[in-house]
Amino acid sequence: MKKYLLIALIICGNLVAFSQSSSEQIIQEKATLPKPYHPEEDGLARIEELILQAKKDNKKILIQIGGNWCVWCLRFNHLVTTDPELKAILEKKYLYYHLNYSPENKNEKAFAKYGNPGEKYGYPAFLVLDKKGYLLATRKTEDMEAINGYDKDKVKKFLQGRLK
């Protein structure tokens, strides 16, 4: 009996240590990544500005919902803004905006108008608007995830409008 108790304690101790080191790694990773969300910003007003720009540029608007608190949000942003191929697709087809959702600013007016798929799917989540501001699609990121990041090919298909 003591042997089984000792084994159980060792396993629990290892799980706690792994959990703590994993949490510490995420905190360190978040500290190194750019923070693209602006909690002080009026999201709906910014989207309205982007619609005017999208009409001029003949582009869609890709809205990434999340916050600087979300490591997966930061990972996605980092991938699409640092990978040359993904960045080129993003810049050619979209105006890219980070709509903040956090305790400091839940952007309730923007979500009242467009919905918040993050509440259903988790964060980040995406809204795709046409150049007139009409909602074309909502998207979760779960199907683009890989271990500790995103699958570049799946993200590319998403940006090209081919990920189903």
Predicted features along the sequence, with ranges:
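Structured helix-beta-strand junction loops
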Residues: 7, 57-58, 92-93
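The canonical Cys-X-X-Cys-His
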Residues: 70-73, 126
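Typically the conserved alpha-helix immediately C-terminal to a functionally engaged Cys/Sec
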Residues: 74-89
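Thioredoxin-like thiol-disulfide oxidoreductase module
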Residues: 86, 91, 95-143, 147-155
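Bacterial Sec-dependent N-terminal signal peptides
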Residues: 1-24
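A short beta-strand-turn-helix
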Residues: 41-61
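Short active-site neighborhood of thiol/selenol oxidoreductases, capturing the structured segment around
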Residues: 57-71
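N-proximal helix/coil linker or "cap" segments that precede and/or mark the start of modular domains
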Residues: 20-41
